[in-house]
């Protein structure tokens, strides 16, 4: 799972640059989207930080706005799940633990971003780095067991590629059927 942490290289709307990489210290579920409460899955897709929790049982935590618009369409309608966080410690069921030092750094960066007036803090969650031989092997292994993953990951790939190419957060929309789409360039 990849949670890119980037900041603007300049104060204007210019490109981002990588400032840190945080390993996910524990996972539950398997590759693929979260679709219902209690499935142990970590969501994959395009999200935002929607809350700050300085009182977390896992040191500190940043809330992820799961379910988003796509999830509300494609997930279990009565019980899609929720309360997904990026947090400290090294245990989790459906969240993304990055350790205490990692969450301290990320939490402060997110607070600083919000204090500078940025209301939306995007978090794009991918199953892995979606390029190169490792990705090809990873995708082949998992889609052989679950062909629906190939169709889902095909929705994530254009935004992943756009960010890697342009170093700007791409605009992603949700189609009426819940599929992600890269918005056309303005």
Regions found by a protein language model. Name each.
Residues 38-185:
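Exported/periplasmic cell-wall-interacting domains
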